[in-house]
């Protein structure tokens, strides 16, 4: 296997909170997949949940080398946890097509948060 890309992002949680206060659910709708949306709606810490998802998706877009453009959208990157609780990525739509085109066979996700920040790193491999 070879590393195709590496992306890291850090999000100030208060910034996400301010956006939600200003525009309601609009950011969550733009960022979250349908499955993530269902979790977010009942999550005991929805702002922190959204900040962490946003960080992973930004990191993934950086790892793919594209950013969020040319048909890619945040909600095409879905963060879920495997049976051990490890964060993983599932791709949809244009993100999945890009991964197939690049020959991506594995994606590694690490996610951390503290009081004020959420941070994520994504590595994609061929």
Swiss-Prot record:
The keyword Membrane does not apply. It is an enzyme of class 2 (transferase). The keyword Lipid biosynthesis applies. Keywords: Cytoplasm, Fatty acid biosynthesis, Fatty acid metabolism, Lipid biosynthesis, Lipid metabolism, Magnesium, Metal-binding, Transferase. It catalyses: apo-[ACP] + CoA = holo-[ACP] + adenosine 3',5'-bisphosphate + H(+). Mg(2+) binds at residues 9, 58. Gene3D superfamilies: 4'-phosphopantetheinyl transferase domain. GO terms for cellular component: cytoplasm. Its cofactor is Mg(2+). One of its GO terms (molecular function) is holo-[acyl-carrier-protein] synthase activity. Its EC number is 2.7.8.7. Belongs to the P-Pant transferase superfamily. AcpS family. Transfers the 4'-phosphopantetheine moiety from coenzyme A to a Ser of acyl-carrier-protein. This is Holo-[acyl-carrier-protein] synthase.
């Amino acid at each position: 296997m070879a590393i195709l890309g590496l992306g890291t992002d850090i999000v100030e949680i208060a910034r996400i909170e301010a956006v939600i206060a200003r525009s309601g659910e609009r950011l969550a709708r733009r960022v979250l997949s349908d499955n993530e949306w269902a979790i977010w709606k009942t999550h005991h810490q929805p702002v922190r949940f959204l900040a962490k998802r946003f960080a992973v998706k930004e990191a993934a877009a950086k790892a793919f080398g594209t950013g969020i453009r040319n048909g890619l959208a945040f909600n095409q990157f879905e963060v879920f946890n495997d049976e051990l609780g490890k964060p993983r990525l599932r791709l949809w739509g244009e993100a999945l097509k890009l991964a197939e085109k690049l020959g991506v066979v594995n994606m590694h996700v690490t996610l951390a948060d503290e009081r004020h920040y959420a941070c994520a790193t994504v590595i994609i491999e061929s």
